[in-house]
């Protein structure tokens, strides 16, 4: 399979000048910028990757933007990684302050993205883990008593959705966090 994974590709279009951001952390200036679709089309055309599988990691983007990136006629990306479902255990929206996952919110996010991408011709890259995330069995399941059942449930959940599943190394074995500390 020939293809490329583009890390945080939706932040390649930035303004020439930044103003003070009193409304947040500055993402509105550099996420899904004005020229990002133009740049992606140029990259596909000039990079010799038309017809290859391309997946883009999307930082803080919307469903509508992912549809735009992946709709078949747009010639930008084959599919998108979005991280909204992995933020359901962020306490007060902070990545390093965790709480019990809100499974109902996760279910609603999956439903919204599944229905939205299908209705508008987009395509999801489905995943639980990557190099920036803890192991899904430890995070969203039980890594002790119900380790096997948790691993199977998470695998079935991802593989029965519409999209292309990605399996992070060790995930096929139901790998858990090492709990060093």
What are these regions (language model features)?
Residues 1-181:
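Active-site and adjacent substrate-binding regions of carbohydrate-active enzymes
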């Amino acid at each position: 399979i020939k293809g490329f994974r583009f890390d945080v590709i939706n932040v390649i279009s930035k303004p020439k000048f930044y103003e003070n951001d009193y409304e947040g952390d500055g993402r509105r200036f550099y996420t899904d910028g004005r020229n990002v679709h133009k740049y992606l089309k140029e990259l596909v055309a000039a990079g010799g990757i038309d017809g290859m599988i391309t997946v883009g990691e999307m930082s803080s983007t919307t469903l509508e933007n992912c549809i735009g990136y992946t709709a078949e006629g747009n010639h930008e990306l084959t599919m998108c990684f979005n991280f909204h479902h992995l933020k359901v255990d962020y306490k007060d929206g902070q990545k390093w302050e965790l709480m019990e996952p809100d499974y109902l919110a996760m279910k609603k996010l999956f439903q919204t993205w599944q229905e939205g991408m299908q209705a508008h011709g987009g395509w999801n890259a489905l995943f639980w883990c990557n190099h920036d995330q803890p192991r899904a069995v430890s995070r969203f399941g039980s890594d002790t008593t119900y380790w096997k059942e948790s691993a199977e449930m998470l695998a079935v959940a991802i593989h029965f959705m519409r999209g292309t599943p990605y399996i992070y190394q060790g995930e096929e074995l139901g790998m858990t966090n090492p709990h060093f500390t």
